[in-house]
A protein has these predicted regions:
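Iron-sulfur-associated redox domains of electron-transfer enzymes in respiratory
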Residues: 2-305
Length: 306
């Protein structure tokens, strides 16, 4: 719908694409996406540049005992819902996806934006923080679409990819955020934790006061984003995929536009459910035209006996 609207639609492509599409650089992927009707594709890692700068500022300030990265929406939601005592430690910084969506809209006024990556949780994040990203697709969905249109992504000379060997392309691997940062404050311990259970254990330790001054990169997926649920290729092993990311990255940085505000609200999300009372239930039944107890049938189709 966005494409047929006639408004230019730009893609923010997650840096894990090099692990998902073997031998394919940003130039080849950009060409294929243009054949689908997109105006162009640029790297989410450009937005990660601004995120890294914010993390570096937090570390340099040294005011926070513990800093937890806020790139992974699943980790953010886990903390917001189930570990609210750890919320003060969660960095109030936009994710690379949100930052890059805003960058694209600043560079191309009036455009629509679509994020494509290996993460299902990004769909929820785009809905929760509306405005930066208009739609989210997974690599699986993109590959299916390309097949439907008989578009083959062919390796081509990737001058655009080679000319900008930015270190924020490391983001989709475990420790990738840390490797993109200048870790100049020796007061902090820098660590990367991946996998939901490991994150849960770490959060419990933080809440119990068992953790000293540190910056923690947290990812819900084992092996971080390259282990995402919507990577559509058969995994050839973490070493192969990390190597693909590492070879595409470097020690440089993106020359990107600045954003006025990189903060992100991450409030507590209550899981308490309000149960309707008898009067509310009677009102619901009345709206269903069930005014007699004999009409209150239990079909059991929901799996419960009442």
């Amino acid at each position: 719908e966005l494409i047929v609207s006639g408004t230019p639609v730009y893609v923010s492509i997650a840096p894990s694409f090099v692990a998902n599409y073997d031998g394919i650089g940003i130039t080849a992927l950009n060409d294929a996406l243009k054949k689908l009707g997109f105006a162009g594709a640029e790297e989410t890692a450009e937005g990660a540049q601004l995120v890294t700068e914010q993390y570096e500022k937090l570390v340099a300030d040294g005011e926070h005992k513990i800093i937890i990265s806020s790139c992974c929406h699943t980790v953010n939601t886990l903390i917001q819902k189930y570990y609210p005592q750890a919320l003060p430690y969660l960095a109030q910084v936009k994710s690379p996806m949100l930052a890059h969506g805003e960058i694209l809209k600043k560079k191309y006024p009036g455009c629509h934006t679509v994020f494509i990556g290996p993460c299902l949780s990004k769909k929820a994040e785009a809905d929760a923080y509306a405005g930066a990203i208009d739609c989210v697709l997974t690599f699986e969905e993109l590959t299916g679409w390309l097949k439907e249109e008989n578009i083959e992504v062919c390796p081509v000379s990737d001058n655009a990819g080679r000319s900008n060997r930015a270190k924020t392309r490391l983001y989709p691997t475990t420790s990738g955020i840390l490797r993109s940062m200048n870790k100049d404050n020796p007061e902090y311990l820098y660590m990367a934790i991946d996998g939901v259970e490991n994150c849960r254990n770490a959060l419990r330790d933080i809440i119990d006061g068992n953790v000293g001054k540190c910056f923690i990169e947290m990812s819900a997926c084992v092996n971080s984003c390259i282990g995402g649920p919507a990577m559509d290729k058969k995994h050839e092993g973490v070493i192969h995929e990390r190597r693909a990311v590492d070879e595409f990255a470097g020690s440089g940085r993106f020359d990107t536009v600045e954003l006025a505000d990189m903060t992100k609200s991450l409030p507590f999300i209550s899981m308490q459910k309000t149960m309707p009372g008898s009067k509310a239930i009677e009102e619901i039944l009345r709206k269903m035209n069930k005014s007699d107890p004999s009409q209150e049938l239990n079909c059991g189709s929901c799996g419960y006996d009442t």
